Amino acid sequence: MRAPQMGSLGFLDKGHIPLVLQLLFLILFTGLLVAIIIQVSKMPSSEEIQWEHTKQEKMYKDLSQLKSEVDRLCRLCPWDWTFFNGNCYFFSKSQRDWHDSMTACKEMGAQLVIIKSHEEQSFLQQTSKKNSYTWMGLSDLNKEGEWYWLDGSPLSDSFEKYWKKGQPNNVGGQDCVEFRDNGWNDAKCEQRKFWICKKIATTCLSKW
């Protein structure tokens, strides 16, 4: 058998070119087949997919449980505030006049305290005793003798009993109300006293 003849440039003769192409095609086909086999082997089986779903469900359950724990630890009120019946109260350690006290509460996202119930009144009266004279958000600045809270609501007749004996007397232009001992007293708004801020407590129910 005659050996294949090399061309002038060292390549095989034209008659042997189809054999080279066949070898090249075989190599490429083999490589492609191997790549397909490897790719298929990486695809997850139905059991693996189910396991992945189960793992994700467990992770979600764990996160939900963690959120519940965080919610229980969530502070309903800021530090130095006191919680009572769904509200937060700040009892000042410094003294201001009535208008400055109102401003200080606004700066904290609150309001100079407005009393909505007899239970709240009892709580505030007892708690404010340690500071003696303490401002609340009640005045008759708009019209003498007509008492209104800062939210514009009038003083209820059922709260009249909390005035101290002989009060309010408007001596010397007393238009703002303070907690004093066991009751309420009207005083000059320019006087410096302790003060109480009030705002609604947080709920810790923010969405994920």
UniProtKB/Swiss-Prot annotation:
Disulfide bonds join C77-C88, C105-C197, C176-C189. It comes from the Eukaryota. The chain crosses the membrane at residues 17-37. InterPro entries: C-type_lectin-like, C-type_lectin-like/link_sf, C-type_lectin_CS, C-type_Lectin_Receptor_IMM, CD209-like_CTLD, CTDL_fold. The gene is Cd209e. GO terms for molecular function: D-mannose binding. Residues 83-198 form the C-type lectin domain. Residues 38-208 are extracellular. The keyword Disulfide bond applies. The keyword Disulfide bond applies. GO terms for cellular component: membrane. This is CD209 antigen-like protein E. Residues 1-16 are cytoplasmic. Pfam families: Lectin_C. The lineage of its organism: Eukaryota, Metazoa, Chordata, Craniata, Vertebrata. GO terms for biological process: endocytosis.
